[in-house]
Amino acid sequence: MAMNYNAKDEVDGGPPCAPGGSAKTRRPDNTAFKQQRLPAWQPILTAGTVLPIFFIIGLIFIPIGIGIFVTSNNIREIEIDYTGTEPSSPCNKCLSPDVTPCICTINFTLEKSFEGNVFMYYGLSNFYQNHRRYVKSRDDSQLNGDSSALLNPSKECEPYRRNEDKPIAPCGAIANSMFNDTLELFLIGNDSYPIPIALKKKGIAWWTDKNVKFRNPPGGDNLKERFKGTTKPVNWLKPVYMLDSDPDNNGFINEDFIVWMRTAALPTFRKLYRLIERKSDLHPTLPAGRYSLNVTYNYPVHYFDGRKRMILSTISWMGGKNPFLGIAYIAVGSISFLLGVVLLVINHKYRNSSNTADITI
């Protein structure tokens, strides 16, 4: 049926009303908000208001950057690469798959003492834990101790979901590629006798991961029975219930395992391996001197052109060593201050000139 055209209907924004009915309209309500009549304030950016902002930013950012940079430089840190691809490296012999297990020793010297608690990290390069399929290759329900997920893992774990017709625990590519080198640190005394450094392996994982996200399957005191019917990941040397003799650090709640399962965002990363606690305020945690690093070499990285390293580091109120943050603050503050000076010169030069318009920014 044809509809008669009515100019008033177009203005009202709707069809004519039916006899006896109310008029329908799409016109917004006549309010300040819907009609965009709210009061507004728009600042006029003049040299007198903008220039102080540039100088204030510069005067704030530069001292902060200097403080962060100096603090970062005061952090003691040493890296020992033990990949072993160089023929002269003590770990070069471990690249052969026939040498199992392989133990190599790297000697190094600390020029300055390490005060306070010392953190030992392992670092990997050219390892892309941020790959989409790799990140998804896990079953969080299984890791949280769910009994049904233990025997029937998620399909996201493929191709590391089942092996030998048994479900893998823990399943997935992340768990299958867990770092498994063993690192031991020794201080070489005056009599050239190695003194072992106590390495604490508990307290390296996030509290929320240890107590919330990761749990062993329910059951009795025998952890092996709780994982009955499952098999170890393909690349693991032992099952998950044999990761540690300490029952509070075994199975899915093993802290080395928990740390590894928190994937890194970049291909070059470090993960906390051990803690070296300070025993006395009278003596440094790691005195200057000669040390040796004993490595049980299990984790091959040369297949993907990767590298491995051990890092010893102290920390400060801002965390670990990170000179970039201080440099960034100094750079932003310097650029802001320099722009303020340039704009101040331009404004001073042309402010009283009658041949040019007033400069507004």
Curated annotation (Swiss-Prot):
GO-annotated cellular components: apical plasma membrane; endoplasmic reticulum; Golgi apparatus; phospholipid-translocating ATPase complex; photoreceptor inner segment; photoreceptor outer segment; transport vesicle membrane
Subcellular location, record wording: Membrane; Golgi apparatus; Cytoplasmic vesicle, Secretory vesicle membrane; Apical cell membrane
Glycosylation-annotated residues: N180, N190, N294
Domain of life, per lineage: Eukaryota
Cystine pairings recorded for this chain: C91-C104, C94-C102, C157-C171
Cited InterPro entries: CDC50/LEM3_fam
PTM statement from Swiss-Prot or TrEMBL: N-glycosylated. Contains high mannose-type oligosaccharides.
Region (Interaction with ATP8A2): 49-348
UniProt entry tagged with the keyword Lyase: no
Span of the signal peptide: none
Record remark: domains: The N-terminal domain seems to play a role in the reaction cycle of the catalytic subunit such as ATP8A2.
Family statement drawn from the similarity comment of this UniProt entry: Belongs to the CDC50/LEM3 family.
Protein name: Cell cycle control protein 50A
Protein's organism: Pongo abelii (Sumatran orangutan)
Lineage: Eukaryota, Metazoa, Chordata, Craniata, Vertebrata
Gene name per UniProt: TMEM30A
